[in-house]
Design a protein with these regions (language model features):
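Catalytic metal- and UDP-sugar-binding loop of GT-A-like glycosyltransferases, i.e.
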Residues: 1-3
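Cell-envelope/extracellular polymer assembly enzymes that use nucleotide-activated donors
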Residues: 89, 166-171
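Conserved nucleotide-sugar donor-binding catalytic segment
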Residues: 51-132
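Conserved donor NDP-sugar-binding/catalytic core segment of glycosyltransferases
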Residues: 6-42, 70, 113-114
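C-terminal, non-catalytic tails of nucleotide-sugar-dependent glycosyltransferases
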Residues: 123-165
Length: 193
């Protein structure tokens, strides 16, 4: 919870329900981005179920996150050397060690936007730090991949090294739309190295 944001009235109750039912090591909820005074909803963030692949490409778990205290202590908590992206780093480290991660598919958090936030004023620094945090995660998890910035703010592309003799299968679900196969194949040929 950031210092200037708001919890929905039912937030703590829903977290308690989740803890009792699922016993997660980490939990997170959906959220809304609201105006500085909280009077207007600017954007809804309906989070997906936990996906390590998606988390590596976008830090979609941001606010209304809960952690098992023992696991947080075991991992050393926030990395104080990171001025920005310390939350993404912690979520990646917890995801590496967690047995259970739960998503509460309900808006429990109001994130107030303001011009002084790091996401608004320090976009280049956020991208550089988050890319480095992701690279550390890839190395810790033994993945032969390089973290690079994606096509837009706060998106990343973990580029996995594939041996020259390694085969890659691509499934193209088109269901009776043969013309889509041609488009997909042309796109793959144009963008694959």
């Amino acid at each position: 919870l950031d210092h200037d944001d708001l919890l929905q009235p039912q937030a703590i109750y829903r977290v308690a329900q989740c803890v009792l039912a699922d016993d997660p090591d980490m939990l997170y909820s959906d959220e809304v981005l609201v105006s500085p005074d909280g009077s207007q909803v600017l954007q809804y963030f309906h989070r997906p179920a936990f996906s390590p692949e998606y988390l590596r490409s976008h830090p979609y778990i941001v606010h209304m996150v809960g952690f098992r205290t023992a696991l947080l202590r075991q991992l050393g908590g926030f990395d104080e050397t990171l001025a920005i992206s310390q939350d993404y780093d912690l979520i990646l480290r917890v995801s590496e060690a967690a047995s259970r991660i739960a998503h509460i598919p309900e808006i429990l958090y109001q994130w107030r936007t303001h011009t002084g936030s790091a996401g608004h004023e320090k976009m280049a620094q956020v991208m550089a730090t988050s890319t480095a945090v992701l690279q550390r995660h890839l190395e810790r998890t033994g993945q032969q991949a390089t973290s690079v910035s994606g096509v837009s703010f706060n998106f990343f592309e973990p580029r996995h090294q594939i041996a020259a003799d390694q085969r890659v299968a691509i499934i193209i679900p088109t269901k009776n739309y043969g013309h889509l196969v041609r488009q997909c194949v042309d796109s793959i040929r144009a963008t694959t190295k």
